[in-house]
Amino acid sequence: MSDDWKANLNIPAKDSRPQTEDVTKTQGKSFEEFGLKRELLMGIFEAGFEKPSPIQEESIPMALAGRDILARAKNGTGKTASFIIPALQQVKTKLNKIQVLILVPTRELALQTSQVVKTLGKHLKLQCMVTTGGTLLRDDVMRLDEPVHILVGTPGRVLDLAARSIADFSECPMFVMDEADKMLSREFKGIIEQILEFFPKNRQSLLFSATFPLAVKSFMDKHLNKPYEINLMDELTLRGISQFYAFVEEKQKLHCLNTLFSKLKINQAIIFCNSTNRVELLAKKITELGYSCYYSHAKMPQQARNKVFHEFRQGSVRTLVCSDLLTRGIDIQAVNVVINFDFPKTAETYLHRIGRSGRFGHLGLAINFIHWDDRKSLFNIETELGTEIKPIPSDIDRSLYVTEDEASIPRPFKIDELPKGNEHSRKRNGYEYRGQPTSQGFPQQPPQANTGYNQVPQGSPQAQGLQGSPQGLQGSPQGIPQGSPQGIPQGIPQGLPQGVPQFPQGYPQGIPPQGPQAYQNYQIPPQQVPAQFNGHSQYSQYQSQPF
């Protein structure tokens, strides 16, 4: 085949960052060898794809041959394109019916996946629709009156559309599940079973994930027809991601996080907490330190979640605090640092969290804050994953996680339009951040003190039990402060929510100190750290002082 048609393609600059064997150890195949439509090849190359990754080499030919597939590969190795490319190849644009259903567990992942479909298939003149909970059902009804070839959605909304006979899957030949382990958990499995009742018996099913528990095996035996099994998980951990832990008490975590902000070179960072309340409180504290920060969790209105996700993907802010909402499949290649502010309880959660950095075989950094209650979890995760999470050194070699040429980092596929939510619109400028995102290490002017704080009386239930917790996250706010948009902290809210910890003696009652300089006079007393910590012995340098 002549390559003249490639000459006029708008191909982005080559990604020059080093990659690990997870994506470079291939059989040397090219996308042209798969017999794909030229229009599809044009979209693939214009998206910056150069050659297939190992999972793509294994899965695309088998999917094109019509086989059911059960594929297991590491996070960030190209699983999404492994099912989107064969789906695009087999869609008949002249047939105005849903021909592919792609199910994903979260709304953010649905948005991202639909955009990959549109980007790779932009020369095919096909129609892709995304449908998730939290958006207006009538918008989906109106959209499905028009041709839709590929439907990307979350299980609950897809089942609703099918049960109401709004979406017709009776002639849909391809069924795809991404993050299949999550999709077949107790939360979703019953819904998936009901959705499949609307499909023809001779459908093709593609299941992709990084982990496959027993639930996936039972589903495969029941619903897949002699599936072709792919397992590229020779080890569970992700190559290219340097993993460290810092032993800190709860009240020292914010202090250590501030130190990391000043020492690390962060392109973009995701910070994980174990609860939605702690997500909001930590985002508020980071903003008080003078750093721009967004947050996201499952209890936020969908329109706010969409806005935060879109802004973070486009690089409008460097730091995102979130719950495990964004551990699944989210691909933002500029993220080079993941911080587990709260250490996860399971190896599966840990693996998906740190997999948000080091995408597609590139380098990344994962830092875990550990305290005494996390000893067992640390040991179990190291044992199950067969990896070592090392004590954090005083200086982390930047070559482990930094790309010197930041211009070479590919920008994410642009999301054309965000779905409208069904929640009430927020006030004017409800999503506007009242400060510009900062360069790393140079905090912007911190928010000005507000004299209208409610005082917490001495001896009251709110004040008792909170003394001595100056910077930690003991307690949690009750709801969202009035006037503070979802996901974007606006400095310090009016009043002190119940459960917010008190600050060092000498500060006015109920008024947190302002900006990084407010913490300079507060010395954290050194703590005694034992020599042994579940098999680790190098703890002498982590005695509560900044590392």
UniProtKB/Swiss-Prot annotation:
Its EC number is 3.6.4.13. ATP binds at residues 73-80. A motif (DEAD box) lies at residues 178-181. Residues 240-400 form the Helicase C-terminal domain. It is found in: Cytoplasm, P-body. GO terms for cellular component: cytoplasmic side of membrane; cytoplasmic stress granule; P-body. A motif (Q motif) lies at residues 29-57. The Q motif is unique to and characteristic of the DEAD box family of RNA helicases and controls ATP binding and hydrolysis. PANTHER family: DEAD-BOX ATP-DEPENDENT RNA HELICASE 50. Belongs to the DEAD box helicase family. DDX6/DHH1 subfamily. This is ATP-dependent RNA helicase DHH1. It comes from Meyerozyma guilliermondii (strain ATCC 6260 / CBS 566 / DSM 6381 / JCM 1539 / NBRC 10279 / NRRL Y-324). The gene is DHH1.
